[in-house]
C-alpha cells in the first residue's frame, strides 16, 4: 500500500482533507472512506491512509467526498462532533499518521511542586542587531511545567558486551549497525571513529575525548582570542569575528520578534508550517512507531544537534553552503562519534557502571554544553568562546519557542544532510528517526524543562570549565609527548602576559 500525500484545513464546523492520488484511474466503486470517532481511514487501491485527529468527528449527511480530476485529488469534508472545537497540529502529518498508542503519554509529565526555585532569570538582557531585548521569564511557571523531569543518568547493569568481534549498535535508540563503515569507504570524513562498527558506547566517549585534545590547537585559539581583544579595525574586518558576534539567525529572530510582540510570552510560540515543510514531513520522514525506553539521550541529542545547527548558521551568516553538513556533523558528538552517552564511565568489579571522576559532578546537559564548546574551539574557522556561548544562548531561545519551533529547526537540519551524496547516512541512522519521533512523541513540557536546565548550566559555566590535554614538551629520551591539562582561561592569561611583555620591551 502507498501512503498518499495530503493536506488538511479546518473551519469552525468541518475538517477539509485533500488526498492526492496521481497516476491512477479513479473508480468510485473501489473508494472506501471510514469515519470512526477521531479517525479517518481512506482506501483506494493502491493508496491507503489512516489519520488520527486530536478530537472526534461525526459521519452524517454533511460529509462529502468529491474527485477533482484537474488536481488529481479527492476532497473530503467531514463534520466535527463539537462545533467551534479547534483541532491542533493539523500541519504535522507524522503525528496524524501515528498508530494507536504512539502518542499516549507523549505530553504527560508529573509536576513537582517542591522543585527548587531558580535564582536567576532564564533570559537576561541581550543585544541583538543593536536592539536591546529585555526578556524576562516567569521562572515559577516554567519550573512547575518542567522541573519534574529528571535529567540524571541512571546507573544500571550493562547488558551489552563487545569482545571486538560482535558489531555494536549506534544511531537513534541504538538501532543501527554497518551503515557508517560503508559510508567511510565513500568519503565520509565526518566520522572520526577508527572502527565505528566495533567500538562500544564507553569507548566512543574515550576516543572522542582523546581526539578532541589532539585536534585542539592552543596557538590557533589564542591567536583568535588576541585578535578579538587587541586587534585593530583592519584585523577584525579580515578575521570577521566582530560581524559574526552581531549576527542572529533567522529562526532566532522569529522567536525574539514573537516574544517582543506577545502579550503572554510564557506560552509556546505559534508556528504555521509552510507547504514545503509539510511536504517534507510527508515525503521524507519515516512513518514508524517508536517504543523508546530511555528518552533522555534523545532530548540531549536534540540539544547538541541544535547547537551545531545554530553555530553553522552564525558561521555562514544564515546561508547553507556545501560545507554546512560537515560543520554540523563535526560539532555534534552524536554524529561525528556516534556518542550519545557523552559521560565516560568506569567498569566496576560487580558489573556496575560508575561515572568517571573526570566528569562525575557534571550533569549530562552540562557535559553536552562543554562538549559543544570544546568542538567549536577545535573545528570551525572561527574558534571563539564568546561565539560558542552566543550559539548556546540562541539554542535556549529555540527551545523556549516550543516544540514546533524545534521541529522547524530539525527539518532544516534534516534537509541539509539529505541533499549530500555522502553525509545523508546520518539522516538514515539518526535524523530521520529523531525528527519523526519528536514530531509524534516530543513533549512541550520536557522541552521547557530542557530549556530551563540548559540555561541554568550555561549560566554557571566559566572558561575554567573548558579544559584540554595539551602537549607541554617531548621526552628527550623517548621522544614521547608529555601532556598537561590547561583550561582556556589559563591559556588566555599566558598569552596576555606575553603580549604585555612584548609591549613593554619592543625589539
Curated annotation (Swiss-Prot):
SUPFAM superfamilies, per database record: HSP20-like chaperones (SSF49764)
Positions of the CS domain: 1-91
Key words of the record: Nucleus
GO biological process, one term: box H/ACA snoRNP assembly
GO molecular function: unfolded protein binding
Family membership: Belongs to the SHQ1 family.
Protein name per its UniProtKB record: Protein SHQ1
Organism encoding this protein: Saccharomyces cerevisiae (strain ATCC 204508 / S288c) (Baker's yeast)
Gene: SHQ1
